[in-house]
Amino acid sequence: MTGVDEILNYQRNPDDDYYALLGCDENSTVEQITAEYKILALQHHPDKNDGEKEAEMKFQKLKEAKEILCDPSKRALYDKWRRSGIAMGFKQWLGMKDHVQQSMHWSKPNTKDRMLEGDGSKPSGPSSLGPSNPATRRASEGGAALWGRWGTGNQEPPSEVLSKFRNYEI
């Protein structure tokens, strides 16, 4: 199977989710990850499970997950791969990261935990703090909607299709 076929036929393995494997969240601290690892490592340690290949493989996966999630630089790379939604395994992505990251400008940023929670009654986020320049916000957040041609005086708004295209909605 070629590299392209592997990507096209890729099925994400639940064991590739190191956070779920350790029973943690991506907001967990290194101390929390280490504590969860110790509990699971005791259960699956090869010395406690004589000759069980499955327990040994699970222990190796747990060890690998702990090593990656406790190292800040490796964890940042893992989180980038995880959020990208790209159809390849983490190890394969790591081998190609310089090439792959160049084309990941389109991936969505992590917006999991906002500082200001929106309850629907008032706007949340940076725009709720006061007037802001829409040119400084991302197009996907309603900013950068600068239209009109430079120097022509044409101030007609762009068509709906053009706006969606510019905001990566189509």
Swiss-Prot record:
The keyword Coiled coil does not apply. Residues 101-170 are annotated as: Disordered. One of its GO terms (cellular component) is cytoplasm. PROSITE patterns: DNAJ_2. CDD domains: DnaJ (cd06257). Residues 110-120 have a biased composition (Basic and acidic residues). Residues 121-134 have a biased composition (Low complexity). It comes from the Eukaryota. The keyword Protein biosynthesis does not apply. Pfam families: DnaJ. Keywords: Chaperone. Residues 17-82 form the J domain. This is J domain-containing protein. The gene is jdp.
